[in-house]
């Protein structure tokens, strides 16, 4: 909303005469602002808890939206406010339901069609394009949580072009022609790399089939591995050529978005090449070449590295949370399992550093001896470390005490103290543990799934 700042300043001088749509937008922005602030900062800045503020501003936004008849509206500003309200809690059941209503409203306004009407200014056209794609980005995120098996149809996006790669300062309500797009990253970088995936699916039937194969389960024998790799390589090339040719890693937005793009590509490669999604040759075994095995391991390590970069970023790390979930657990388990066979090299050293980060940030993995999944993961980690220890001590001549990480020592101490004997099978995982790793939504662990996963 490039013109919003001026309107907010005007409204502050005459709040009694602020229009209903703008009122809804303002309260939605207040709600979004609170969601981006930590609990401690809320208490320090406003003297109230984050929960109290969220309840207050959400209620105010709902009242403001109701005053605009937002579920039957044809006003563009009201739909903008509606979208911002939903964005404040993108993975909730309410958002999942209401996003469909918002998209239908957008269709009734014609947002899904390229509008060439001479009375609509370029500025208005660009705002309509941006909102349409934002609505579908939100819908995709909601589907991934609430209805992960629902098929995404490329036709849902209409024939609208992508938003331009320009900064808000390049836009003005009176301009009659579009500005020249930038060839370097802009303020739109983060959203454009997400929208590019949808544009990729819409423009390529093959890409749509590969995407469905990756995220909704493989259809065995229907598509060659070479074709899947070719399609993923194409998306990676689009990212590099269109958005990251002139990126600057010193700029936080550039660095975070680059990590998000790398994570998206690495996650696709991991899912495509993982043995669980491939046809077995005989006796349940999956044949993989050394090159494929290396690619799979590298993809898993890259994905975990990029998640670490995003989560520990000082710049809007919350943008990364929806890209983790159970996939992150899958990648960790695969990496740790493969480390039983991979003992040396830079990539192995990086993998162990990432495993160490995992245990340091989640001490319950060591302390909770009654959680069968944590115990099994610890046993797998110790088995992998034994192979690494032998390589370091015997192959490189270093002292064991100099290279043993603290988390490994703690795992050994836990085993030697016999705490593992108190484990009861099966148990329900702690609902408050491993929030960022996606275990909080599971009522029980699917042991058949994990046993199959570890059968490498």
Region spans (language model):
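C-terminal transcriptional activation/regulatory domains of eukaryotic transcription factors
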Residues: 1-77, 82-93, 118-123, 181-184, ...
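Hydrophobic core segments within long, regular secondary-structure runs in both alpha-
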Residues: 5, 26-30, 51-65, 82-86, ...
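Eukaryote-specific, cytoplasm-facing alpha-helical/coiled-coil scaffolding segments in long proteins
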Residues: 10-14, 55, 109, 129, ...
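Acidic, serine/threonine/proline-rich low-complexity intrinsically disordered regions
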Residues: 37-54, 91-99, 118-120, 148-160, ...
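Alpha-helical junction/boundary sensor with strong preference for TPR arrays
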Residues: 65-68, 72, 106, 113, ...
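Amphipathic alpha-helical protein-interaction segments enriched in hydrophobic
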Residues: 75-83, 126-129, 191-195, 252-274, ...
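Fungal transcription factor middle regulatory core
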Residues: 107, 112-234
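C-terminal, low-complexity intrinsically disordered regions in eukaryotic proteins
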Residues: 166, 177-182, 191, 196, ...
């Amino acid at each position: 909303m490039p013109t919003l700042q001026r309107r907010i300043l005007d409204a502050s001088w005459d709040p009694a005469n602020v229009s209903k749509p703008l009122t809804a937008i303002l309260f939605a922005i207040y709600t979004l602002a609170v969601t981006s602030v930590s609990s401690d900062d809320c208490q320090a800045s406003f003297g109230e808890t984050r929960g109290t503020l969220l309840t207050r501003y959400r209620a105010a936004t709902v009242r403001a939206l109701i005053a605009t008849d937002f579920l039957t509206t044809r006003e563009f500003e009201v739909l903008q406010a509606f979208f911002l309200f939903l964005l404040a809690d993108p993975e909730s059941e309410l958002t999942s339901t209401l996003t469909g209503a918002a998209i239908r409203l957008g269709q009734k306004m014609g947002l899904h069609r390229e509008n060439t009407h001479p009375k609509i200014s370029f500025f208005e056209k660009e705002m309509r394009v941006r909102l349409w794609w934002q609505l579908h980005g939100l819908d995709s995120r909601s589907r991934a949580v609430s209805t992960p098996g629902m098929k995404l149809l490329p036709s849902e996006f209409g024939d609208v072009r992508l938003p331009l790669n320009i900064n808000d300062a390049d836009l003005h309500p009176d301009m009659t022609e579009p500005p020249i797009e930038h060839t370097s990253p802009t303020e739109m970088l983060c959203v454009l790399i997400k929208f590019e995936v949808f544009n990729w699916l819409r423009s390529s039937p093959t890409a749509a089939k590969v995407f469905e194969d990756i995220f909704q389960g493989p259809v065995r024998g229907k598509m060659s591995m070479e074709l899947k790799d070719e399609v993923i390589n194409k998306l990676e090339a689009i990212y590099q050529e269109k958005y990251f040719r002139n990126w600057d890693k010193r700029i936080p937005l550039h660095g975070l978005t680059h990590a998000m793009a790398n994570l998206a590509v690495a996650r696709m490669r991991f899912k495509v090449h993982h043995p669980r999604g491939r046809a077995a040759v005989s006796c349940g075994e999956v044949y993989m070449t050394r090159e494929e095995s290396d690619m799979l391991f590298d993809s898993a390590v890259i994905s975990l590295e990029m998640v670490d970069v995003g989560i520990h970023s000082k710049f809007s790390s919350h943008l990364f949370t929806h890209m983790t979930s159970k996939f992150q657990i899958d990648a960790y388990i695969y990496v740790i399992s493969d480390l039983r066979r991979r003992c040396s090299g830079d990539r192995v050293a990086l993998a162990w550093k990432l495993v160490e980060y995992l245990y340091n940030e989640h001490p319950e993995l060591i302390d909770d001896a009654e959680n069968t999944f944590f115990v099994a993961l610890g046993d797998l980690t110790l088995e992998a470390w034994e192979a690494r220890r032998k390589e370091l001590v015997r192959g490189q001549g270093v002292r064991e005490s100099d290279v043993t990480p603290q988390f490994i020592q703690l795992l050994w101490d836990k085993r030697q103290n016999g705490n593992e004997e108190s484990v009861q099978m099966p148990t329900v995982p702690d609902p408050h543990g491993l929030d960022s790793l996606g275990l909080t939504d599971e009522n029980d662990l699917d042991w058949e799934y994990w046993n199959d996963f570890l059968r490498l």
